[in-house]
Amino acid sequence: MSANSPTGNDPHVFGIPVNATPSNMGSPGSPVNVPPPMNPAVANVNHPVMRTNSNSNANEGTRTLTREQIQQLQQRQRLLLQQRLLEQQRKQQALQNYEAQFYQMLMTLNKRPKRLYNFVEDADSILKKYEQYLHSFEFHIYENNYKICAPANSRLQQQQKQPELTSDGLILTKNNETLKEFLEYVARGRIPDAIMEVLRDCNIQFYEGNLILQVYDHTNTVDVTPKENKPNLNSSSSPSNNNSTQDNSKIQQPSEPNSGVANTGANTANKKASFKRPRVYRTLLKPNDLTTYYDMMSYADNARFSDSIYQQFESEILTLTKRNLSLSVPLNPYEHRDMLEETAFSEPHWDSEKKSFIHEHRAESTREGTKGVVGHIEERDEFPQHSSNYEQLMLIMNERTTTITNSTFAVSLTKNAMEIASSSSNGVRGASSSTSNSASNTRNNSLANGNQVALAAAAAAAAVGSTMGNDNNQFSRLKFIEQWRINKEKRKQQALSANINPTPFNARISMTAPLTPQQQLLQRQQQALEQQQNGGAMKNANKRSGNNATSNNNNNNNNLDKPKVKRPRKNAKKSESGTPAPKKKRMTKKKQSASSTPSSTTMS
């Protein structure tokens, strides 16, 4: 770089431009890769900067077009994807609908055969139907005890080889009340309703709602031979019990000793190889309505079912328990009399002598305690209801009682009105006995007044009955009871606050309206006076007790300061004769009070 060249005017202050020609090395402003100089006009046209500007403008235009096209293509692709998804969904829905229609057509053309169910209802049929199934539970009978347990798993019961009593299961004695009740249910063929929850918790197997109980009688056993014995030995034996046919094992019985030593030897061999087996019975325990109800309650103990579940449950129970429900109406005996006997009918017949129909009834019973001997016995509702306040309160919610009370109230109104009218007529007669004309006039007036009073009383009673017998009376009675209860609580609180004893049990219950404001004011004034009197008495008592306490304290303090002086001994007074005087008796409290009362009365 030349030292004379100004720094501010030199655009290339950091050195010589790169790749410059040697002729242009000294020129400070020549750009990189500069071609040789040309005509300015041509240079303007073919200038590289102008070319680059024009190319950049063209490229920018093409770029903007491609961006718009890309956005449009993306939108088209999105629309195409959405359309393809919709078409796929439509095809799937059509396939599903087609499959459903196809299956429906198959069901209509080729109906499924109904499952044949073997309905049995009596106990023998149910036992025969489930004879190859395991029983629900077992009942073992021993000499001194009984046992209830779950069924054994093996076909050959363990109790057959070991008939002694084991500890598994519920062991009961002969005198147990639970055992007696259970045996009663077994004899009746009913499931005990008290063990429904236990059966559900123990997972006992039910068969069409029934329980199959297998009974083992260990007191009456039979000799059973195993299957390894020869057939000739088994052929000579005969079964001893026809009821014990639960297992296919042979029952060996000793034959009569008529054939000699060979038979006895065979019998002894059979006895050695056989073992004792208890007699086995099967019985059925059926449910009833109470056990079904307890079963439903046990299932609904911790869950609350909806109405639909309850209805479905009830329908299934009715289907299983009341399958042969007959809804046919019985024949009318009077329309189908020709199908019945003549003695089964007793029709009324016309008696020409009495000129009336005579109805033939059966003779009344003459047993003691029957209606034919005792007659009609009036019940509680047939007794006349007395319109007392207590009974009206106790029976205030009974509609029948209100009508009877209203009737008695109406009768009492009319009776009082007639008494008032009769008393007024008697007074008028006594005053006007001087002249007959005036007496006749007063009698007519009294009768007219009596009729008017009676009519007014009847109208008032009818009005009372109409107002007290409507539907609004029910609400008014409830309102009255609530108000009476509130007033009772208020009186109780007032009595407790004022230290007044509550009303005794035999006090008269007022059925009138609540107290008026004037009565409440008088009651408050009386309570205030009683409180003042009680307060003054308490204050006087407190003052007296305070004064006594202060005087006692002062005396005690003085006594503490001074030493205690010994009192001189009292010598017994002697009489003039020299003998000691008799001791005076102390007066009792009763005599003191009796002697003090007249003086107090005289002083007052």
From Swiss-Prot:
The uppermost taxa in this organism's lineage are: Eukaryota, Fungi, Dikarya, Ascomycota, Saccharomycotina
Q: Does the keyword Transcription apply?
A: yes
Q: Which residues carry this modification: Phosphothreonine?
A: 516
Residue positions, PTM Phosphoserine: 446
Source taxon at top rank = Eukaryota
Kindly state the subunit structure of this protein.
Answer: Component of the 1.8 MDa SAGA (Spt-Ada-Gcn5 acetyltransferase) complex, which is composed of 19 subunits TRA1, SPT7, TAF5, NGG1/ADA3, SGF73, SPT20/ADA5, SPT8, TAF12, TAF6, HFI1/ADA1, UBP8, GCN5, ADA2, SPT3, SGF29, TAF10, TAF9, SGF11 and SUS1.
Other remarks on this protein: Present with 4150 molecules/cell in log phase SD medium.
Question: Where is this protein found?
Answer: Nucleus
What organism is listed for this UniProt entry?
Answer: Saccharomyces cerevisiae (strain ATCC 204508 / S288c)
Q: What is this protein called?
A: SAGA complex subunit SPT20
Q: Which Pfam families match?
A: Spt20_SEP
Which family, according to the similarity comment?
Belongs to the SPT20 family.
